[in-house]
Amino acid sequence: MGAASISQAVYAAEEPAKPAAAAPAVVKPDPAKGDTLFNTAPPNGVSCASCHNADGNSAVAVNPKLAQQHPEYILKQLQEFKAGKRKSAIMQPMVQHLSTQDMRDISWFLGSKPVKNGFSKEKDLVALGERIYRGGIPDRMIPACAGCHSPNGAGIPAQYPRLGGQHADYTDAQLKSFRDGVRANSAQMTGVARKMNDREIKAVSDYIAGLR
């Protein structure tokens, strides 16, 4: 090997490795942009607010209240609608035009809005609903809802959704969807709901509506 070749080999060995490419920076959520996205209809479409109201407090019992929900939970649901992991003939087309940043902006906008209080309506079931929510049904291995969603329904940020004040009709429908395998994006909730009958689901859903 010639001197020039040796010199080149030594230089190559000593040349510092190039730094790895930096990961793309995560852009901070912009609730103001989220407000615009939520309340503005896309071309040939309808706005999110048309079903959930301008501040996320849906007045229609089958449409969920989104106000004050943990942003991380909303973001996860939007992403799973788009990916098809959570099925909905209404929501899947609604989110297809949204980027991840759009979803983040919308999620943090909704998380910043106060939820309006709800009310329990089923007087004959409220005691059963409270018993299930706070203590579960131990002999059937049904855990207390409060263990994950907190005694007042506030949930745990970035882990478990807020439930307090949610429309009973919506909660009832979601629990049945988990139970019947229609909604399959939470193995934990599917396992719980499969052990509950219609009366128990109705009772706990009504109790949740009155939490605050």
Regions found by a protein language model. Give the residues of each.
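N-terminal export/targeting leaders of redox proteins
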Residues: 1-28, 79, 199, 209-212
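Axial heme c-ligation environment in periplasmic c-type cytochrome domains
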Residues: 59-65, 81-121, 157-162, 180-212
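Stable alpha-helical elements in mature extracytoplasmic
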Residues: 30-33, 47, 70, 77, ...
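Electrostatic cytochrome c docking/interface patches
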Residues: 13-42, 60, 112-138
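The feature marks the first
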Residues: 24-83
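Sequence context surrounding c-type heme c attachment/ligation sites in exported
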Residues: 35-49, 75, 134-146, 158-173
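The canonical Cys-X-X-Cys-His
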Residues: 45-54, 106, 142-151, 204
